[in-house]
Amino acid sequence: MASLIYRQLLYNSYSVDLSDEITNIGAEKKENVTVQIGGFAQSQYAPVSWGSGETLSGNVEEQTLDGPYAPDSSNLPSNCWYLVNPSNDGVVFSWTDNSTFWMFTYLVLPNTAQTNVTVNVMNETVNISIDNSGSTYRFEDYIKTSPTQSYGSRNYLNTAHRLQAYRRDGDGNISNYWGADTQGDLRVGTYSHPVPNAVINLNADFYVIPDSQQEICTEYIRGGLPAMQTTTYVTPISYAVRSQRVARPNEDIIISKASLWKEVQYNRDIVIRFVFANNIIKAGGLGYKWSEISYKANNYQYTYMRDGVEVVAHTTVSVNGVSVYNYNTGPLPTDFMIRNYDVLKESSFVYVDYWDDSQAFRNMVYVRSLNAELNQVRCVGGHYSFALPVGSWPVMQGGSVILTFDSVTLSTQFTDYVSLNSLRFRFRCAVSEPPFRVTGTRISNLYGLPAANPMGDQQYYEASGRFSLISLVPSNDDYQTPIANSVTVRQDLERQLDEMRREFNELSANIALSQLIDLALLPLDMFSMFSGIQSTVEAAKTFATSVMKKFRKSDLAKSVNSLTDAITDAAGSISRSSTLRSVNSVASVWTDISDIVDSTDNVVAATATAAAKKFRVKEFTTEFNGVSFDDISAAVVKTKMNKLNVVDEELLPQIITEASEKFIPNRAYRLIDGEKVYEVTTEGKYFAYLTETFEEVVFDAERFAELVTDSQVISAIIDFKTIKNLNDNYGITREQALNMLRSDPKVLRSFINQNNPIIKNRIEQLILQCRI
């Protein structure tokens, strides 16, 4: 009778209302289609007819001098002239291969008498003799060819303009200017000593000149630099339009203007504040387990001053690429466990969508030349105490990341009431001190920012900087770009969904066990499932369609396609490993396997666990006359939905889909092979026992591998530990034992009607796992 409701969802998840499907396809098309409109980015709809306005055009002269650049030490590209313009005397150039050739150039000022000077060049203190009795500057080259040799003067350049140029060809030979610019013997000389990858040290400001323009470089050596070093644009436009402006931090500049449209450059200082939010969900049971600690998107509104004007800003922060950790101290109900908790690591990104009420965001639809600069943000985690019923509380504390601005794009920010065209700033995460830990556990010295308390003692995190963009806007400032803007797009669906989850989980205590068992032992169908929710059959059909559409994208539905391959792979992995050794009589199979058997058995444990997770789908797709875990899940869903105060057609499909995937995470499945039973759990436990005496025997991995693909999988509603406990305390017949192993509904109901505490406690524990 295995879970008819979920079986119907699976088989019918691709049969939905045609009108709903057409609407869904239309929405996806709107979302995914991109219209190319030139150099502008599009966020929604373009005007019917528009142009870029008047555009400045003309010829651009190539910039001859690229620079000046600050002093540099690197493997500079070859086949370029590097024109140095030092402001002081001393070493202006050095170069070596650290084995057979050392060279540096010393600038000697005019009218310098002969003297000895000490210089520090290439990590070496050198004494040299300098002399320049003339009225021009002298660039003197000093060279040596062995480490023990002294530097000697080789060539020089006398120039009135304090300029010298260097070039390295493809083989690594260095060329520079020799002679004198005033005596007509200025020439280019080459030191033939190929060193392709040697580092060149330029200790003065320098310019870069293409090798093809060596003649221009020579003219600069002779005549000096031109008066102004900027790119020259020759643009034939009217004097009424042409103007020169210096951009200020907060300014609107009209780039071009036509009758209907104009391009405006917006420059803005910006202060970004954001607040991380999280979901902390406590699992069912005795209060020692947490199912999820995760980040969630969060909105934040604030004000700040910009040039004396108050700015109202709105941000939405979200994360991507988080690392998911877990921690489990053991299988007992009183063992502390965190099933999943998010941590921001080096591979994570933080996205902040920013909007403010300034003119820049009023028409942010067609945008180009978007740039931004922001400072770093350091985020330090705080303390979060896990409130246990008994004993000392574990405390998660510490953790830190540094957010570095990475890029900026356009985005649409959804608030509770409107959608806003925004800027999305992406920050890259880098871990920092201190690490985080959980007191009283093995979790320590881990780096990153956990989601338990990412804000620490901070009210908000803040990043300051500026952005600039060019936007195409209507020429009339009273008009607004015709887009679907400022409409109600959602009424905080996330908040409503959280409230429904909370109400759904709180109903666990109000469910009568006898009523639930009776319901779980009945074959539910789609309409009995929704009968307590919708009043008419037609409404139930529509609601069922919505559930199917949601269920179609669930992990459970997707895993059916890969079921056969997954089970076969699991069986193959087990059969290739060695057979398990006998378990000692004093060792319980419910203790940690790794403490009892060798590392080879760990392979079997891991593979058996993987197979156990797939057994649910295998059981799900085959007929089974006993009670399954999904029958209990469906019964809990139906009972809770009947008690919900608010029924929302948009939210309930999400709840049902989550329930199908998350209810009863700790499951056990068994395969019966004559008088022998093989049982594996999703927690990594595996063992074999006899049906006659419940005595544990050797787990034959090869036989288990043969049974995996062919035998019927049974939900171990009453697991081995519970059956053994029942037999030891009350005694059960062989027939009762076999029916219990097959999860027979009549036998389960009879034990519950007799108020058997062991069976009732087991069922109650399963129901407590039905939380999302």
Swiss-Prot record:
Region (Hydrophobic): 388-408
Top-rank lineage group of the source organism: Viruses
Motif extent (YGL motif): 447-449
GO biological process entries: permeabilization of host organelle membrane involved in viral entry into host cell; virion attachment to host cell
Coiled coil segments of this chain: 483-510
GO cellular component term, pick one: membrane
Similarity remark: Belongs to the rotavirus VP4 family.
Note: In group A rotaviruses, VP4 defines the P serotype. Some rotavirus strains are neuraminidase-sensitive and require sialic acid to attach to the cell surface. Some rotavirus strains are integrin-dependent. Some rotavirus strains depend on ganglioside for their entry into the host cell. Hsp70 also seems to be involved in the entry of some strains.
Protein name: Outer capsid protein VP4
The organism of origin for this protein: Rotavirus A (isolate RVA/Cow/Thailand/A44/1988/G10P8[11]) (RV-A)
